[in-house]
Amino acid sequence: MSIFNRFIGATAAFLMFIGATQVSADTIKIGVLHSLSGTMAISETTLKDTMLMLIEDQNKKGGVLGKKLEAVVVDPASNWPLFAEKARGLIEKDKVDVIFGCWTSVSRKSVLPVIEELNSVFFYPVQYEGEESSKNVFYTGAAPNQQAIPAVDYLMNEIGVERWVLAGTDYVYPRTTNKILKAYLTAKGVSESDIMINYTPFGHSDWQTIVSDIKKFGSAGKQTAVVSTINGDANVPFYKELGNQGLSASDIPVVAFSVGEEELSGLDTGPLVGHLAAWNYFMSADAEENEVFIEKWKKFIKDKKRVTNDPMEAHYIGFNMWVKAVEKAGTTEPEAVQDALIGVTTPNLTGGVSAMMPNHHITKPVLIGEIQADGQFDIVSSTDGLVAGDAWSDFLPGSKDLIADWRTPLSCGNYNVKTGKCSGQNY
């Protein structure tokens, strides 16, 4: 090959490289970190689709800062260490500007050190146990004071529940939430003998003995309820076994924190009518914004039978907040976006306007829904206004004096109001 031809070839290759770099730079990359396989796929696949819809819709509006948005989708496969590996790849290899993802707290805890080390921006869309506030994470799901505590109050005040079964999957979210609930119930005068706690592994399928134990526990003459933090596809055999053993909502009502419209779509809901769920959004919410969202979702997914649920709304809120913050900051640079997000407001899907608080949690209504035969929820209770999420529980001794405030000059995730000190680690 002649020197001239080599020069032409090298020049062409260089120009192709520059062109590819420019194309890449002309998009803003969004990481989508949700399980598309494994035990959590039943819940998380829909959240991946939600993000693709939101990104497509924003691109139709012109994108952000004059650039199109590009989704980078990965599958951590319900494998908790793999979440961290995939998150690192999204930031270091794919150069994403923000990540939306996770469902379980164990996956979030796996991702968190990576997000902080590489100083990225992460939106977490699912209810969780609290006891955490990171500068890099924005929690658009419910904290315990926005779901678990109000659900217990409803069961206690409206149904007269006196005995409590705290049933959960064996990982950090159910264990910490139940620790908070046990402390709360004890403070309300409930005896320890009236509290039953049970944990099962992810994907648990044999519920016969456990449901039988619940039935026996509820036969002591006091109104009994199950507070469920069971996650993933284990919910399907759990509810089936309730039906098999004839446990109806009038006998022992179940209030679930991780069962919504998507999970019910795979069940025979007949035996489940009357059981409850506590969320901040239901598909049945009567609001114009919700009608528009549902119509857009069904058109995007090309299936009129597909439902919407609470974590989808959380992604809707979080994504719109991120767009506003980036436009406000004029950049996708992480620290500028983190600062710009505080105070950002956006309409939610229940008719209100949610705000991002200094502790990186948002304001949300609290709703209790009753399962109907068609797999939808009848909203039987709702707060008068929006409730701000607490990062730290008022009912745990080590947390009740802590607050999170990421505004300068405090800029702390666990500031002790009694000692006036920031403890450093935020989780």
What are these regions (language model features)?
Residues 241-316, 326-332, 383-414, 423:
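Extracellular/periplasmic periplasmic-binding protein-like sensory domains
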Residues 1-11:
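Bacterial N-terminal signal peptides that target proteins for export
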Residues 85, 129-130, 136-245, 284-292, ...:
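Extracellular/periplasmic Venus flytrap/periplasmic-binding protein
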